[in-house]
A protein has these predicted regions:
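His/Glu-rich zincin catalytic helix
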Residues: 1-85
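Acidic/histidine-enriched segments that form metal/cofactor-coordinating
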Residues: 77, 82-184
């Protein structure tokens, strides 16, 4: 695709619509204009979640296996850089990981372009050191312990584990303490 393809999709019932943009790189972008809002939100979502633990590259014959919890680990780490922690700079940032998606978001009332460029930069240029990886492993380990205090969460993953003996959906989105310790 040499040019961006822009389509406006309108919902007659709601009386509003959005733009669907197919960027020449293949990235899909959705813009929902809301003139009455004073805040602007941006979400960068990718089709990469907790079940994506096995990959095959086009230049290799074998599969690459990564530890359970890697998508969630990256969700935590991608808001950091050597110079900047996005959570310290912006009041409203967030991220989430599901079985098949990871999303990064921010809200601002000004400087949208600068904020958006920073979000894209965090995703495109991750920052890792041995120290920050170890620190995050500890934080996620505590998060895993916290999930164990939730009967609903434990029930869900006990059920998934009983239903799916081999599929990665049976493993907690955050991984296990063992699997996150394998992330280097």
């Amino acid at each position: 695709m040499s040019e961006n393809k822009i389509t406006y999709i309108e919902n007659a019932v709601l009386g509003e619509g959005y733009y669907s943009i197919e960027h020449k790189s293949g990235l899909r972008i959705f813009v929902y204009p809301k003139e009455e809002y004073t805040s602007t939100y941006a979400v960068f979502g990718t089709k990469y979640g907790s079940i994506d633990t096995r990959f095959k590259r086009s230049d290799r014959a074998d599969f690459i296996e990564i530890p359970a919890g890697t998508a969630h680990f990256l969700e935590h780490k991608l808001f950091e850089s050597e110079e900047l922690d996005a959570f310290q700079r912006y009041a409203k940032t967030g991220a989430s990981t599901s079985f098949d998606r990871t999303c990064y978001l921010f809200m601002c009332t000004g400087n949208f372009k600068e904020n958006f460029e920073i979000l894209i930069d965090f995703v495109r240029h991750p920052y890792f050191t041995e120290e920050t990886v170890r620190k995050e492993q500890g934080i996620i380990g505590q998060e895993i312990d916290m999930y164990k205090d939730s009967p609903e969460w434990e029930c869900l993953f006990n059920m998934l584990s009983a239903m799916y003996h081999k599929h990665p959906v049976r493993i907690d989105i955050a991984g296990t303490k063992q699997s996150i310790s394998e992330i280097t």
